[in-house]
Structure formats: C-alpha cells, structure tokens
Amino acid sequence: LRKIDAIAVVASAILVAIVWRFADAPITAFAERIQSSNIQDTIRIANRFGGGMNPAMVIFFFLVAGVVYRHHRWIAYGVAMAFAGAAAGVSVQIVKYTAGRTRPELWLGPFHHARAAATSFPSGHTVGAFALAGVLMLASPSRTMRVIAFLLALSVAVSRVMAFRHWTSDVLASAAIGMILAAIAVRAVMTAEVSFRE
C-alpha cells in the first residue's frame, strides 16, 4: 500500500465515523422531508445502475467492444471490472451478515444492530458501482470517462440513501470499499501485463 493510499483509507474511515456519529439520522430525516414522486422515479433509475444484471452488462460491454474494436485498454477495463465486481459481491455478503446494521427504513436509529435481519452495511449497490466505476476512475486517461463513471456511481450511492435502504455512513464506507477493490483489480491486471494503454 502506497503512503497516499494509506492516507486515503484513514481519511475515509474518519469521515465515515464522523458521519455515522453525527449526520446519519439528520440526513435520513432530510431525505424523508423532500420525498416526491419525481424523486422516487429518479431513485428507481439510479438504483438500476448498481444492481441486477447491469454491472454484468457493463463488464460484457467493455470486453466485447474491446475485442470488436481491438481496444486492448477496454479489454483490460473489462477484466479489471470483472475481478473488482466478483470481489465486491463476495466481500459485501461477508461483511453485511457480520456487521448486522439495521436499515433506515426500520426506523430503529443509526446505532441499532440486530444481526439476524439487519443488512444495511455495506451497500452492495454502492460497493459494486464504485468497484466498476473505480476501474475507469483510476485507469482511464479520458477525463470525461472518469467523470461520467464517478457521477453514475455517486447517483447509485445517493439513491440508496434516498430510498431509505442505507445510512449515509453505509454508502460512504461502501464507496471506499469499492474504490479499494477497484485499485486492487487495476493493479492486478496491470501486474499481469494486460495493458491499459493502446
């Protein structure tokens, strides 16, 4: 782990702890106050980016487009996304059932833990979205692609809070987990000499 990586992990942990302690409940209360049918429609669209078959379709797109158009970088993106996505799926299930944090929709408060039915932390949608988007954010030379990837992943994270499926600290920590998995996948693919350059 490089020094900058360690600093980013520590800073993320401190931010998550502060939000968990002081901001989770007020942010969720604010989300409840601003609910509308338009916001609900937007939440449904954003949720689709992070769940179901959409992550697999993104990976498939990069692999196929890379092969068809002979863009080795896109193939490398697809391979790194596949590794990051698989790691996200496994790690989310392990942590989710170990942490036992209750979801905001149960209205038990941000400090309530009940292992049997509590699956708020981490947000699988957010970990997956940032794991895949993180590959592009870390490896793509295109600023436009990096910004679009970040905004799509961010929309997933915000939608999970607005849908009362996760606390804000859940999605912040989940975004950090996703980025860590993306960094590991990018380094693994680069080490295996799959080129991110044309």
Each language-model region and where it sits:
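Hydrophobic, aromatic-rich transmembrane alpha-helices
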Residues: M57-V68, A129, A133-M137
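Hydrophobic alpha-helical transmembrane segments of integral membrane proteins
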Residues: V79-P104, H166-M179
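N-terminal transmembrane-helix/juxtamembrane module of multi-pass inner/ER membrane proteins
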Residues: L1-F61, K96-A118
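Interfacial segments of alpha-helical transmembrane regions
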Residues: D5, F62-S91
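Membrane-helix interface segments
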Residues: N38-I39, H71-A76, E105, P141-V147
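Alpha-helical membrane-inserting segments
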Residues: V19, I27, S91, V95, ...
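Membrane-embedded catalytic cores of phosphoryl/pyrophosphoryl-handling enzymes
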Residues: R2-I7, L108-E198
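Aromatic-anchored segments of alpha-helical transmembrane domains
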Residues: I14-W20, A86-S91, L152-F164
